Amino acid sequence: LHYFQGSLEFRVRQGKQRGGVILADKARKQISILGGVLLVLVGVRYWLDRYELLSGDIKFKGQTTTGAGYTSANVLIPAKLLLTVIAVLCAIAFFVSFVVKDLRVPALATAIMLIGEVAVGGVLPWAVEQLSVKPNKANKEAEFIARNIKATRFAYNLRDDNLTVMPSFGKENAPAPQPGGKGVASTLSNIRLLDPNVLSPAFTQSKQLRSFYGFPDTLTIDRYHVGNELQDYVVAVREINPSALSGNQTDWINRHTVYTHGNGIVMAPANTVDAIVTDAGDRGGNPKYEVYDLQSLAAKQGQQHTTANNGTAHLDLREPRVYYGPLIAKQDPDYALVKTAGDSQEYDVEGENYTYQGKGGVHAGGFANRLAYAIEYHELNFILSNLINGNTKILLNRDPRARVEAVAPWLTADTSAYPTVIDGHIKWIVDAYTTLDSLPYAQKINLGEVDTDSQTARREWSPTMKQVSYLRNSVKAVVDAYDGTVQLYSFDEKDPVLRAWKGVFPGLVKEKSEMSEQLRQHIRYPEDMFKVQREILSLIHISEPTRRTPI
């Protein structure tokens, strides 16, 4: 640009006329400022590169380990510091040239910096790696592998005080438990006969109730007291299944204003079947269902409630309607319109409709709101429909996991939410994690790959959380299936990341002591976290760095 404006000339020396590159004063000043700013940014990049090296890769015995190795720690990091100083000095030279009207000094300084980048930042580290580190890899890298082990144990909560070693586990000569031994009877009686991974079709066939209801493909396990004993139950919420709607059920009014909520929770003791199967002709081996829904609630009205031990969980479910759940949320777009104009619109039970009474949802009335939703969902009915009035609400973000991540975007929700009954409502419990993607020296893992095994298909983690180097199950989230209320409770109060976020958002996460006793009874160790820790232990179960072997 300066060339075409005449501010920059390339002259050949003729007689007494000076040759070379001729810069006008305004061009020189601009180059001085731009060059100085550019070199300041280069210096900042060199400075930050030092920290990035702490999350680099160490190649050791065929295995890739996270962290700065011998060469990075002893050569590259000091080299980056030296280059930072050189870049800053070069920037100062450019700024000084703005006054002294001479670009030769900053040009020479820049050339020196480029030579230093090649020599100190490239040739020297290569020489140290090839001539010093590789011939003595075990000794040179041992200190840094030890740092990796320590940081990784901290990052995934696998420190010695959190681990219990079972010395007799897996040994052939380990003593067998005696039939009359402590806890043996209760353990044997609680052995699961029902597999939640394959039981969904049985629940659907027996307890679907209506064709537009459904259960998730994989059910879950929860614990309830039966008498004085704690017993495992296979549990599933009966939700609206958007993919099961057919015919006129799929039009806009029915899909979003009529079929708005599910109905109840279905359970079966995991250690019991209805009858023993002895041959192929027997019709036994099915779950012994316990159903808590609108119909069972109506049947109990007027009857004396009993708490006698008849082998059931006796759930005190007072609101079985389910407006929020992972199956409902598969509807695209995921919203429901409630409190619409006229008579009750929502299907409840056969022959009866219902009007939502919860505090959840956003007001959809008013022309501005209706226009905004019409644009958002490309749906003209928001403007044209007479069903939407000043009282109408729209229920959004109906996936419990999505609600948790919307309330606290700095948390990563577990790949599954499990239902339970607390305070008379069906509630979803979501394990939430604090994560970091580049904790120095901590081993990086791909969550999608680690969480996949023979029993579990690849799960859907948040797209931004494909790879992490820090994972703590620090928060338990509870989402009300009726009104969508989200409550967060701190569970790992020693987690420094959680403490930092609680300082940023005071009052958002409640203390662990504020958990109700009923909620505490349904807290479990997250399966996803267990799989991640299992994978990490397979890498660092040997604490001596020189004894580590390839995967």
Report residues per predicted region.
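Soluble extracytoplasmic regions of secretory-pathway and membrane proteins
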Residues: L1-S543, R547-R548
